[in-house]
Amino acid sequence: MSPVTATEVRREKARARELRASGWWKRRLSRERCGYCAHPTPARELTMDHRVPLVRGGRSVRSNLVPACRACNAAKKYLLPVEWAAYLDRLADEADRIP
């Protein structure tokens, strides 16, 4: 996979801004749940996250966008879905080891 250029990232961010104003995105937010942890979160506090980050080749298309609480979005950063799942598994394993 070739590196993603700054121009490509800017173009995808512009597409994300357009989608953020769409009825489709507003309906997604109206569920008031994080797409990762499913924690109830007011719509105004949900962020738009790219499942496959832009810098890793992701696009601003509906199938790659998910409402995320700020905590999940900040923790996920530039992880791919498989890396994010492994991270969550590690957290669960660590929590199981706590007496």
What is each stretch, according to the model?
Residues 47-48, 71, 78:
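Alpha-helical architecture
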Residues 1-36:
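Short, charged surface segments at domain edges that flank catalytic/cofactor-binding sites
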Residues 38-65:
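Histidine-centered nuclease catalytic patch
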Residues 2-6, 19, 55-64, 74-99:
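Polybasic, low-complexity binding patches
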Residues 38, 70-73:
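Cys/His-coordinated zinc-binding microdomains
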Residues 33, 47, 68:
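The −1 position to Zn-ligating cysteines in a subset of zinc-ribbon hairpins
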Residues 30, 41, 89-92:
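Short linear sequence elements within intrinsically disordered, low-complexity coil regions
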